[in-house]
C-alpha cells in the first residue's frame, strides 16, 4: 500500500473533544474524504501547552501584528506560555515530514487569517492571525496551509490539495540522490501543471532549469523548490486551463479527424462558458493522448495531479 501523505491538523477538526467547552469541530470532508489519502498529525495548542479541558475561553487583544492571548473573564495573560510552547512544537514538527497543515478558522491560537483582535476599547477587528498559526507559518514558509472553513470553497480546496501532493512528489525527489538530471526530469513532468498557474513562473522556472549546469545541486534544489511552491500557490483559472488544453491539443492536432477536432474544440468552449467542468475536456484530451501515443503528454502531472476520487475537477 502506498504511504499516506502526512499533514498537520487542528485536533478538534478530527472530532476530538479538546475545545474550551469540551466540544469538537469535526470536519467530515477532512476525516472521511481526505482521510483516505492523508495521515493526520494532530495539534491542539491549548491542550498541549497545559490549559486543559474545559477551560476559560480566550481572545487576542492589542495590536493585530503583536497581540496578547488573554482569557475572556479573568483576564489571565497566556501569551508567553503559548509562544514558548509553539516555538518548541514547531521544532518537533520538523521531524514529522509534514506536507501541509489545516488550521481551525477564527481560533485565537490556530486561525490562519481574519482572526478577531480586540483593541483597548473592546472593539474587534478581523485582522489577526492565531498565535500558534503565525509561528508555524513563519517557521515553515513553503508549506501549504489552509483553514477548515476555506476548504469549503472548491477552488481553494483544489489548490491546497494540489500543493500537498506536489510537495510530496518533490520530497520524494529530494530523498533520492540530488542531480541536475533528476531535477530536469521533475520539471519536465510538471511543466504544464506550472503553466496552468501562470506564464511568469513557468518562464522563471524554465530559465532556472536551463541554467542548471552552471549551478550546484546544493544551491539549485532550494531555489527551484521555493519558486515551484510559489508558482502553485497562484490560483488556476478557466482561461489558464484553456491555454494548457490548447497547448496539449497542439501536439496531436494534425492527427485529429475533422469530427474529433470539432468535438474537442466544442468541449473547450463549453468549459469556457461554464456549462461543463474541467474533467470533461481533460478526459477527452487523455483519450487522444493515448490514441495518438504522445509520450511527452503521458508523463504530464497536469493530467493527474491528485487522486481522481477527490473529484476536485468535477465542478463547473
Model features per residue range: what roles?
Residues 14-19, 110-111:
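Short glycine-rich His-centered loop
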Residues 10-11, 44, 102-106:
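Short beta-strand segments
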Residues 74-95:
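Glycine-rich anion/phosphate-binding loops
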Residues 2-7:
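Extreme N-terminal starter segment of soluble prokaryotic enzymes
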Residues 144-316:
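Acidic, Ser/Pro/Thr-rich low-complexity regulatory regions
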Residues 17-18, 22, 26-68:
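N-terminal glycine-rich anion-binding loop in soluble enzyme alpha/beta folds
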Residues 59-76, 116-126:
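A charged helix-plus-loop insertion that forms the helical arch/lid used to bind
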Residues 89, 93-174:
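Internal, conserved structured core segments that host functional sites
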Amino acid at each position: 500500500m502506498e504511504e499516506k501523505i502526512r499533514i498537520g491538523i487542528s485536533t478538534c477538526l478530527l472530532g476530538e473533544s479538546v475545545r474550551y467547552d469540551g466540544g469538537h469541530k469535526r470536519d467530515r470532508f477532512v476525516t472521511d474524504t481526505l482521510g483516505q489519502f492523508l495521515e493526520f498529525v494532530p495539534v491542539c495548542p491549548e491542550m498541549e501547552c497545559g490549559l486543559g479541558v474545559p477551560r476559560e475561553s480566550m481572545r487576542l487583544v492589542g495590536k493585530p501584528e503583536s497581540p496578547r492571548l488573554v482569557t475572556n473573564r479573568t483576564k489571565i495573560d497566556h501569551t508567553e506560555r503559548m509562544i514558548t510552547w509553539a516555538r518548541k512544537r514547531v521544532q518537533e514538527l520538523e521531524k514529522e515530514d509534514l506536507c501541509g497543515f489545516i488550521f481551525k478558522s477564527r481560533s485565537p491560537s490556530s486561525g490562519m487569517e481574519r482572526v478577531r483582535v480586540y483593541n483597548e476599547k473592546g472593539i474587534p477587528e478581523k485582522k489577526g492571525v492565531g498565535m500558534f498559526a503565525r509561528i508555524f507559518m513563519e517557521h515553515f514558509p513553503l508549506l501549504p496551509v489552509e483553514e477548515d472553513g476555506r476548504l469549503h470553497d472548491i477552488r481553494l480546496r483544489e489548490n491546497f490539495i494540489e500543493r500537498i501532493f506536489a510537495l510530496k512528489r518533490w520530497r520524494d525527489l529530494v530523498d533520492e540522490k540530488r542531480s541536475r538530471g533528476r531535477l530536469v526530469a521533475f520539471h519536465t513532468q510538471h511543466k504544464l501543471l506550472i503553466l496552468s498557474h501562470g506564464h511568469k513562473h513557468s518562464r522563471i522556472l524554465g530559465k532556472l532549469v536551463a541554467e542548471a549546469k552552471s549551478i550546484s545541486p546544493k544551491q539549485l534544489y532550494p531555489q527551484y523548490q521555493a519558486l515551484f511552491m510559489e508558482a502553485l500557490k497562484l490560483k488556476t483559472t478557466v482561461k489558464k486551463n484553456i491555454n494548457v488544453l490548447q497547448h496539449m491539443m497542439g501536439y496531436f492536432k494534425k492527427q485529429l479527424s475533422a469530427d474529433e477536432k470539432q468535438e474537442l474544440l466544442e468541449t473547450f468552449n463549453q468549459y469556457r462558458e461554464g456549462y461543463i467542468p474541467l474533467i470533461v475536456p481533460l478526459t477527452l484530451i487523455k483519450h487522444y493522448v493515448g490514441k495518438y501515443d504522445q509520450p511527452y503528454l503521458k508523463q504530464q502531472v497536469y493530467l493527474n495531479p491528485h487522486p481522481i476520487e477527490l473529484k476536485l475537477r468535477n465542478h463547473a
